[in-house]
A protein has these predicted regions:
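Beta1-alpha1 glycine-rich phosphate/pyrophosphate-binding loop at the start
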Residues: 7-71, 75
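Feature captures the FAD/FMN-dependent oxidoreductase FAD-binding
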Residues: 17, 28, 64-105
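A short, basic/flexible loop-to-alpha-helix module at the beginning of a structural domain
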Residues: 1-8, 103-105
Length: 107
């Protein structure tokens, strides 16, 4: 089954950089931002970094990796960023379209 999703900005990967990019895109005026993540949760490698030491510069407090990712995930949700989990980008076309596959369909 094929679906069409329109967005102003599509970000591939919901690791730290992807989450920050999604938030920045919304703050800069992008109306619809979509993050495509191949895993079943947001946060990327930070979900595995259970030791403290993150967040000192940005949040001014010491956080574990999952706590740090959680702050960005919360902020991303506050800015109404859309996500596709368990999905992989298969192709990006010159006109800005992309083909994304999840476990059930191709978008």
């Amino acid at each position: 089954m094929m679906h069409s999703i329109k967005c102003d900005v599509a970000i591939i990967g919901a690791g730290p950089a992807g989450l920050a990019a999604a938030i920045a895109a919304r703050k800069e005026g992008a109306k619809r931002v979509l993050v495509v993540e191949r895993d079943n949760k947001l946060g990327g490698i930070f979900q595995q970094c259970i030791h403290p030491g993150f967040g000192l510069t940005y949040f001014h407090e010491e956080l574990t990796g999952p706590e740090y990712a959680g702050r960005f995930i919360d902020e991303m949700r506050e800015h109404d960023v859309d996500t596709l989990l368990n999905s992989m980008v298969l192709e990006i076309s010159p006109d800005g379209g992309m083909i994304v596959a999840d476990r059930k369909s191709v978008v």
